[in-house]
Amino acid sequence: MEILKRYIISFVTLVTLSGCMKDFEPETDQPSVLCLNAMITAGEPFELSVTHTWRYSKPVADPTVGDADVALYVNDEFVERLVYDESRPEDGSAPKSSYKSAYAPASGDRLKIVAESERYGAATAEVTVPAPPTVRDVKAEPAVTSTWFSDHGDGSYAIDLSFRLSIIIDIADVDKSANYFVFDWANGSDEEETGFRFSLGSLNYDAEPVFSEHISAFESIMGSDAWGFSVFSDRRFAGKSYPLKAVYNNCSFYLWTGYDPAEDYFHPTVEVSVDNISKSYYDWLIYDWHIDNGFIGSLGDIGFADAIISCSNVSTGAGVVAARARTARSVDLHDFIMDTLNNLQNNQQ
């Protein structure tokens, strides 16, 4: 290990001392092409962004292509032509434009989008809408780390709880094909008007191994980690079930009004979801991670490695048309909070 450290230090020193950059403008006349981007959610109509590419050294004010003809095919059958819509926000910000579908794709649909422009040519993208993940069970394992109690003397009091929350999501991989997922969450309640405030702590990405499955041993040694990245595949549990564990540190619950344990008026909740995503989206997310956080991406930025080629499922090589299907669950912490509050109240008597 000591020898490895010396090699790493020597390599980093070499990169630092010898790296250089030089502006380079290739004398090529690369024509602009169509760029397609969309996130298609099962069961919902979708919006498609149609823009054109441009030279990095010659930026354009608005790359939107508003006169394209966009056709949608589902399972090899023509369904509709998407309608161009330009909305102008009331706050005066730049207009938002997209091509909108009336059709709501279902899981299993094979979608083909064909866009044509007289000026920028044609672009085609294909994607299959995945099925929602099978989540068999979701359970919470909270653990109190500290408490604070203040008796106001008039029958009311204030309580502040700090706790760690582990949420275990049992995902069943029932599909024989490869599957790709994104885990997400939201604080489902912050009800100050009812006399309490619940704050969900930060997710400990290192507590769940699948969040770092894309990181090589070498990248780990060089300091890469999975912070901020909750994308994973079923490579570790293909055809099986997997207990995904989300650990949140430094959660808090604060109650500052009088309360009656018999009242059932507060339900601090956490909304968790698992998306089954298309491979086109998974590939792009992995590419984006390597560019921003990977060691090879960092070397490429300074000319010591080949540039990482962007991922695209559009025929022109520009843009990503992705699809997803979501399974969401709500985790109610009411019973845990009530039991803890009652224990605190009894201990004060």
Question: Where in this protein do the model-derived segments appear?
Answer:
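Sec-dependent signal peptide recognition
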Residues: 4-10
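C-terminal motif of bacterial Sec signal peptides marking the signal peptidase cleavage site
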Residues: 17-19
